[in-house]
Amino acid sequence: MTQVASTNSPLLHAEQLSSIRGGRVLFENLDFSVSAGQLWQVSGPNGAGKSSLLRILTGLLEPSDGVVSFDGQPLNQNWSEYCQQLLFIGHKAAVKGELSALENFHWQQQLSSVQDVDAWDLLEKLGLLGLEDELTTRLSAGQQRRVALTRLWATQASLWILDEPFTALDVQGIALLQQRFVEHLDAGGTIIFTSHQSLTLSGLTPEKLSLEYRGEVL
């Protein structure tokens, strides 16, 4: 059993979570609680189940066993409220392929009514300037991930669940994303993100949940 203690009232609680995929045990009997305003880093090697855990926490994937609760209730009992508070960016970037990089950002702004962001400055800092008019289907996987990350500057969601958000970012992009993390946490937001490698985040000390590659086949 893996258990990480939380001192505050939990926003998100996982109880006895287990995941078995393709006959292989990814993890089992995970217990942890995430409080509002916390930053959590889920780490571990490829194949340890990090992405599966995040998808379970978002409700997109059913656990093999266990329950995820939001604000004291199982996800299936307050799904609508949960979705209003959640922003999920998976390992495979979810972008609208029929829109350009710039249009993707403006589309997200319209959905969230967040307008006080300089889109051109943001695209430049994420290394997307010069690609703003390209359809996202023509961009590389790394470029698409950076387009998806622009959503973090155009959302009012309080809970962010992000799969490998620092992948494909250069030094400037990493610094920019770290600053956005700080802004969101200072505003009372909550972040859960994965990383397959050890990260040193300037000014940030995340709670850590480490998964191991088990390789057990049932």
Swiss-Prot record:
GO cellular component, one term: plasma membrane
Record-linked SUPFAM superfamilies: P-loop containing nucleoside triphosphate hydrolases
GO molecular function, one term: ABC-type heme transporter activity
Keyword Endoplasmic reticulum in annotation: no
Major localization class: membrane
Disulfide bonds: none
UniProt name for this protein: Cytochrome c biogenesis ATP-binding export protein CcmA
Organism, scientific name: Idiomarina loihiensis (strain ATCC BAA-735 / DSM 15497 / L2-TR)
Lineage: Bacteria, Pseudomonadati, Pseudomonadota, Gammaproteobacteria, Alteromonadales
Gene giving rise to this polypeptide: ccmA
